């Protein structure tokens, strides 16, 4: 699912001052990439990225002021198209009257901010990348365990929320329960968050819905987290062979990214919170180049080889 971001959302998020073209605030912003239209102001229109937010800083405005009035008017008309989501003036600079008049005539939102050009560019790009990223929703619980984003999945009633509650009591942080919104950013990272309606809430059968932040404090929750590991909880199946060494490397595809997947069988007496906690720590160790399962397999192979040599 692809989200739609409109210029009005950018204005609200970054507290921008709207100077002209308010009727165009409903225009969609189709890409997180911004445009510094220096070449357009210089008269080269061939590759004008008119569907991007246009950012005019000190360099562009200084050059624009050096043009004749006729050229300023011409370039302003080129800037303001039906597809242009908006024009942003940075550093609080005065707005050339030609740009203001053409923006108003074409209903192109003309905005201004006191922020430095490079700073506001970076902030808006990050905001748009997150909002426009491909998104899906999955049933599960997302918890930050020792800095590792662990998505706990499983059938309804298997104990996901109860396990998350125990993890929160052990000092870890809840991101989302029941429904996890997952966005894939430009660098193929999966970032999970909770829908606004159920943010910081946890459903425990027999108790009901609890507010984790109210009960355990602000340190027990976070708004979003990169998903690094998926743990699938399933009822113990005596006829199924589960990985007992750790050499199996399974993954699960979410959008376009593959995420490591562990399957943990559930049966009475197993402390799932501790097991998942250890799984997160083991994942961190593997990222540091320490793989206990592979080291054990290597030692075992060496021992067998030595034994065969003695025969």
Swiss-Prot record:
The keyword NADP does not apply. Residues 202-211 are annotated as: Important for the catalytic mechanism of both phosphorylation and dephosphorylation. Keywords: ATP-binding, Carbohydrate metabolism, Kinase, Magnesium, Metal-binding, Multifunctional enzyme, Nucleotide-binding, Serine/threonine-protein kinase, Transferase. The keyword Transferase applies. Mg(2+) binds at residues 161, 203. It is an enzyme of class 2 (transferase). It catalyses: [HPr protein]-L-serine + ATP = [HPr protein]-O-phospho-L-serine + ADP + H(+); [HPr protein]-O-phospho-L-serine + phosphate + H(+) = [HPr protein]-L-serine + diphosphate. Belongs to the HPrK/P family. Homohexamer. This is HPr kinase/phosphorylase. It comes from Exiguobacterium sp. (strain ATCC BAA-1283 / AT1b). The gene is hprK.
């Amino acid at each position: 699912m692809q989200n739609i971001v409109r210029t009005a959302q950018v204005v609200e998020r970054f507290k921008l001052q709207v100077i002209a073209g308010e009727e165009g605030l409903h225009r969609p912003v189709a890409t997180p990439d911004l445009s510094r239209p220096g070449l357009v102001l210089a008269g080269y229109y061939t590759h004008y990225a008119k569907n991007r937010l246009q950012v005019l800083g000190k360099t562009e405005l200084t050059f624009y002021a050096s043009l004749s009035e006729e050229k300023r008017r011409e370039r302003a008309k080129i800037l303001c198209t039906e597809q242009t989501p908006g024009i942003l003036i940075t550093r609080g600079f005065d707005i050339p009257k030609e740009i203001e008049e053409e923006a108003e005539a074409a209903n192109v939102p003309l905005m201004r901010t006191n922020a430095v050009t490079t700073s506001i560019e970076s902030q808006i790009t990050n905001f748009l990348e997150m909002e426009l990223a491909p998104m899906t929703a999955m049933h599960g619980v997302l918890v930050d365990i020792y800095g590792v984003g662990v998505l706990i999945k499983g059938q309804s009633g298997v104990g996901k929320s109860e396990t998350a509650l125990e993890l929160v009591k052990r000092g870890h942080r809840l991101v989302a329960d029941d429904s996890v919104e997952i966005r894939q950013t430009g660098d193929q990272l999966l970032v999970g968050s909770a829908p606004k309606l159920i943010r910081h809430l946890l459903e425990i059968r027999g108790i009901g819905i609890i507010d984790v932040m109210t009960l355990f404090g602000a340190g027990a929750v976070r708004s979003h987290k990169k998903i690094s590991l998926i743990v699938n909880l399933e009822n113990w199946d005596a006829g199924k062979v589960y990985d007992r060494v750790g050499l199996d490397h399974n993954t699960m595809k979410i959008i376009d990214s593959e995420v490591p997947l562990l399957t943990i069988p559930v049966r009475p007496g197993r402390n799932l919170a501790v097991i998942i906690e250890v799984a997160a720590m083991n994942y961190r160790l593997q990222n540091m180049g320490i793989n206990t399962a592979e080291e054990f397999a290597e030692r075992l192979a060496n021992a067998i080889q030595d034994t065969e040599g003695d025969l």
